[in-house]
């Protein structure tokens, strides 16, 4: 079994990279891929960089070169659901683009022409994530719609508009839908696992910097626990 793990920022991948045994680094297209084993499972770890284009290119190369059985996108996100707080975990049931709008041509808000309205995460991986969450004591989790856009959601008016169009979304970030769309194209099962570094619209630029390490730690701990369950 081979599991690919993708995070955008150094803080989001460093803890996982430190757990890789027999670590080897390969560079393709300017992206660094870290290869080795965690809990006796072959892993490919990618720091994609921020944004949808970076995530799509890095994920496409990863799948084509290494053919993983599963893709897990990890890192931080901004919370949208009123019951969530900084440090909580969100697990994707589905993923969409919140900044795509071709509705004049009959598509749903967030839908890329020729693609589904949203991308469904793998049921098996969702189940593994839910069972693994018990390892993070006193951490709230929620699963649902995660939405992606190429902007940091900090303006109250943007938050209000996005919430109007996507009332069911639980979190927003800047890479997940690109990873999901790429996995959909390659028919590779995926799940998005994010820990909240901020709550959308609540002074989140400052909060993000303060709590990024906490969010990265929670996400990494959950990924490590998921690998243990996948092995069994």
UniProtKB/Swiss-Prot annotation:
Coiled-coil region list: none
GO biological process: L-methionine salvage from methylthioadenosine; L-methionine salvage from S-adenosylmethionine; nucleoside catabolic process
SUPFAM superfamilies with a match to the protein in the record: Purine and uridine phosphorylases
Annotated metabolic or biological route of this protein: Amino-acid biosynthesis; L-methionine biosynthesis via salvage pathway; S-methyl-5-thio-alpha-D-ribose 1-phosphate from S-methyl-5'-thioadenosine (hydrolase route): step 1/2
Gene Ontology terms, MF aspect: adenosylhomocysteine nucleosidase activity; methylthioadenosine nucleosidase activity
InterPro entries: MTA_SAH_Nsdase, Nucleoside_phosphorylase_d, Nucleoside_phosphorylase_sf
Catalyzed reaction equations: S-adenosyl-L-homocysteine + H2O = S-(5-deoxy-D-ribos-5-yl)-L-homocysteine + adenine; S-methyl-5'-thioadenosine + H2O = 5-(methylsulfanyl)-D-ribose + adenine; 5'-deoxyadenosine + H2O = 5-deoxy-D-ribose + adenine
EC class: hydrolase
GO cellular component: cytosol
Pfam families given in the database record: PNP_UDP_1
Family: Belongs to the PNP/UDP phosphorylase family. MtnN subfamily.
Function field: Catalyzes the irreversible cleavage of the glycosidic bond in both 5'-methylthioadenosine (MTA) and S-adenosylhomocysteine (SAH/AdoHcy) to adenine and the corresponding thioribose, 5'-methylthioribose and S-ribosylhomocysteine, respectively. Also cleaves 5'-deoxyadenosine, a toxic by-product of radical S-adenosylmethionine (SAM) enzymes, into 5-deoxyribose and adenine.
HAMAP family: Salvage_MtnN (MF_01684)
Protein name from the UniProt record: 5'-methylthioadenosine/S-adenosylhomocysteine nucleosidase
Lineage: Bacteria, Pseudomonadati, Pseudomonadota, Gammaproteobacteria, Thiotrichales
